[in-house]
From Swiss-Prot:
Keywords: Transposable element. It comes from the Bacteria. This is Insertion element IS6110 uncharacterized 12.0 kDa protein. GO terms for molecular function: DNA binding; transposase activity. It comes from Mycobacterium tuberculosis (strain ATCC 25618 / H37Rv). SUPFAM superfamilies: Homeodomain-like. One of its GO terms (cellular component) is plasma membrane. The keyword Transcription regulation does not apply. Belongs to the transposase 8 family. The keyword Disulfide bond does not apply. GO terms for biological process: DNA transposition.
Amino acid sequence: MSGGSSRRYPPELRERAVRMVAEIRGQHDSEWAAISEVARLLGVGCAETVRKWVRQAQVDAGARPGTTTEESAELKRLRRDNAELRRANAILKTASAFFAAELDRPAR
C-alpha cells in the first residue's frame, strides 16, 4: 500500500494472526495461502500486511535475519535523542557566539 492510507492494527490482532498462520500452515499448499486465509478470517484488508507480521515475528524469534522490533524501537529512540541533542547544541553555539560578541565590546 505505497502512498495509501495506513491502518494500525492492535498488537493482539497481529500476534493472533501470526499464531493462526503457524497453526493452519500445514492445511494449505503454501505459506501464502495460509496467510491469505488468515487475513480474510481476521478482516485484515491486505494479505501482504499479515505476511509482514509473520516475517517480523520470525526475525524477532531469531529464525530469520533482520532488525528486530526491539532494535527498531531503540534505533528510533536514539535518532530522536540525537536530533534533540543537535538542536540543543545549535542553540548553545548561537548563545555562546552572542555572549562572546558581548564580551568583546568595549565597556562604556
